[in-house]
Amino acid sequence: MTAKLIDGKAIAASLRQQIAKRVAERSQQGLRTPGLAVILVGSDPASQVYVSHKRKDCEEVGFISQAYDLPAETTQTALTDLIDRLNEDAAVDGILLQLPLPAHLDASLLLERIRPDKDVDGFHPYNVGRLAQRIPLLRPCTPKGIITLLESTGVDLYGLDAVVVGASNIVGRPMAMELLLAGCTVTVTHRFTKDLAGHVGRADLVVVAAGKPGLIKGEWIKPGAIVIDVGINRQDDGKLVGDVVYETALPRAGWITPVPGGVGPMTRACLLENTLYAAETLHD
């Protein structure tokens, strides 16, 4: 048995087409074009690449993209003032603060400063709290994208044993809440969990977001399980690999996401989806 691939690139492209179509329809109806403000502080190379992709995505679907590229020495006060201005700007439906920030800035305070109805990353405690209470509004992009990928398989998630590896605020914790919402029985683990192999081995669905290449061995995977690999790690030879040993997981899993081309494109597409949702449902 060889796993079926979950093609995040293709699913994300289809989602972007749907969003672009809706933006065009809004324009024909005389409605406002959705707007996304993207804030980049400093010159971290990876962040610059991510931000350029997000701005390109905005152009593709017809959003108005506002770019704020700030020097690394930008103060907490200056950034707070910018967020306050964007909060009050009716042309802005979403505010994205690219992480990580320079060490002297308090990311938690700044993320909380973004108005919850413009928090298209889904990081604000209000939006995380709504997800926990089973009334999601703006959902964290990576877990939301993963749910879309899982839905594309046609597999009924209700009642599945799901194991999340990694407990970050950005992926692991909200992912667990999304899977609970989908009716899974969820276990959250991390790289220091005792008998991690045992937990993974009984899972019908494994979502791995630990940031450690090759952490999950292919032989640990339960035959036929769904494997979602969120990890993206660059090796010395420049090759990108996930947190799962792909070559040995492929013959055991039922479904698997590739790295790259799996979860990453969906995270970006869901940022656009959240921005459109904010424009239509929260701001129109």
Swiss-Prot record:
One of its GO terms (molecular function) is methenyltetrahydrofolate cyclohydrolase activity. CDD domains: NAD_bind_m-THF_DH_Cyclohyd. One of its GO terms (cellular component) is cytosol. Keywords: Amino-acid biosynthesis, Histidine biosynthesis, Hydrolase, Methionine biosynthesis, Multifunctional enzyme, NADP, One-carbon metabolism, Oxidoreductase, Purine biosynthesis. SUPFAM superfamilies: Aminoacid dehydrogenase-like, N-terminal domain (SSF53223), NAD(P)-binding Rossmann-fold domains (SSF51735). It catalyses: (6R)-5,10-methylene-5,6,7,8-tetrahydrofolate + NADP(+) = (6R)-5,10-methenyltetrahydrofolate + NADPH; (6R)-5,10-methenyltetrahydrofolate + H2O = (6R)-10-formyltetrahydrofolate + H(+). Pathway: One-carbon metabolism; tetrahydrofolate interconversion. GO terms for biological process: L-histidine biosynthetic process; methionine biosynthetic process; purine nucleotide biosynthetic process; tetrahydrofolate interconversion. NADP(+) binds at G166, A167, S168, I232. Its EC number is 1.5.1.5, 3.5.4.9. HAMAP family: THF_DHG_CYH. Homodimer. Catalyzes the oxidation of 5,10-methylenetetrahydrofolate to 5,10-methenyltetrahydrofolate and then the hydrolysis of 5,10-methenyltetrahydrofolate to 10-formyltetrahydrofolate. Belongs to the tetrahydrofolate dehydrogenase/cyclohydrolase family. This is Bifunctional protein FolD 1.
